[in-house]
């Protein structure tokens, strides 16, 4: 098995099939798995609903290698599996779209994800389940395929070779680029920030540039830079202060795209006390999500008929992520949500706070 972080090295002129398995949302699982006693990872009925060969070994390996597995209950494992699938889509689509390059230097011309949706209620590679409920990976693909997108590639240590020291600092070599499918050049403002996961502070000065995104091409913006090592003597057991690299692309003062590169693996990071806030508008047609500290993989648990404008996203301090809500499945008592490292699945208050 290959790490999904290595997607950029697994490309071709056309990627005809690739994917990653994930559980559907909880509502779908509970509809297809009966009796209730079978609703847990590894049960006979759960295995029956997964037709992939060696699925136990493959899915569990990807989760255990990358994410903090503090509980094996259905809700927690569902979120972690969905996060793995979503991260795979982010790494793959952004890397391969970058390889579209420019005229005369095209390296990758397209990719087909396996698969779009299911033909029966199951656990599979689909990014939309049998009841047309979208998994977080669907939104990761949508974000990566925006007409104007920004991407970050960050160096990753090999933490599975048995001879690594997880307390050492990540040197964080990184690159930033813009992918455009528009037919005209676009002048944009690019801001790259370096944010401490532990404190939310900016650990070095941001990179701010005005760039011209070329039409139907990739525009390389930051190439081969290395972020400085940040001392962490007063913050805990490690020898550095882990931080995210966060890029924001604006056109005429409006945010067109963002991307965030985290230190790998995510399971070594402390996600406690994120200070997440979820607030409904007065008419409950939108919800605003914010956090005091960087958050990974914020996911609303979706149900049949519910329509969200976005899901499965990261949150940075100082930003407000607005999600529009619609459809026949709008939850009247509040949407259930969680994120990587959350102590428990939390429920947003239904009373408006705006």
Locations of regions flagged by a protein language model:
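Intrinsically disordered, low-complexity Pro/Gly/Ser/Thr-rich segments with frequent PxxP/GP/PP motifs
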Residues: 190-240, 305-331
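Long, low-complexity ectodomains and other extracytoplasmic segments of secretory-pathway proteins
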Residues: 144-152, 160, 255-283
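Terminal connector regions
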Residues: 177-178, 220-274, 324-354
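Substrate-binding clefts and catalytic carboxylate motifs of secreted carbohydrate-active enzymes
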Residues: 1-186
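C-terminal accessory/binding modules appended to enzymatic or scaffolding proteins
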Residues: 272-326, 340-342
């Amino acid at each position: 098995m290959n790490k999904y972080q290595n997607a950029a090295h697994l490309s071709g002129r056309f990627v005809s099939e690739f994917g990653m398995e994930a559980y559907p949302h909880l509502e779908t699982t509970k509809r297809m798995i009966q009796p209730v006693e079978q609703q847990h990872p590894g049960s006979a009925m759960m295995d029956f609903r997964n037709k992939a060969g060696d699925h136990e070994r493959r899915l569990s390996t990807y989760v255990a290698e990358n994410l903090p597995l503090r509980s094996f209950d259905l809700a927690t494992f569902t979120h972690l599996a969905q996060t793995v699938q979503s991260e795979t889509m982010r790494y793959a689509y952004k890397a391969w779209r970058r390889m579209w390059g420019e005229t005369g230097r095209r390296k990758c011309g397209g990719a087909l994800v396996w698969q779009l949706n299911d033909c029966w209620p199951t656990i599979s590679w689909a990014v939309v389940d049998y009841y047309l409920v979208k998994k977080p990976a669907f939104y990761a693909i949508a974000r990566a395929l925006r007409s104007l997108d920004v991407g970050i590639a960050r160096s990753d240590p090999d933490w599975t070779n048995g001879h690594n020291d997880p307390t050492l600092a990540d040197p964080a070599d990184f690159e930033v680029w813009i992918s455009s499918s528009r037919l005209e050049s676009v002048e944009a403002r690019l801001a790259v920030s370096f944010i401490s996961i532990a404190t939310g502070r900016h650990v070095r000065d941001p990179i701010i540039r005005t760039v011209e995104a070329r039409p139907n091409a990739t525009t390389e913006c930051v190439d081969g830079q290395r972020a400085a090592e940040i001392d962490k003597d007063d913050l805990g057991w490690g020898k550095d202060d882990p931080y995210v690299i966060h890029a924001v692309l604006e056109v005429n003062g409006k945010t067109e795209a963002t991307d965030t590169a985290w230190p790998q693996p995510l399971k070594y990071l402390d996600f406690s006390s994120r200070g997440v806030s979820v607030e409904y508008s007065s008419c409950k047609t939108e919800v605003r999500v914010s956090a005091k500290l960087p958050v990974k993989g914020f996911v609303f648990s979706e149900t049949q008929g519910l329509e969200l404008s976005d899901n499965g996203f990261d949150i940075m301090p100082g930003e407000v992520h607005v999600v529009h809500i619609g459809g026949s499945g709008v939850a009247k008592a509040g949407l259930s949500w969680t994120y990587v490292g959350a102590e428990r699945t939390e429920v947003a208050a239904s009373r408006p706070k705006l």
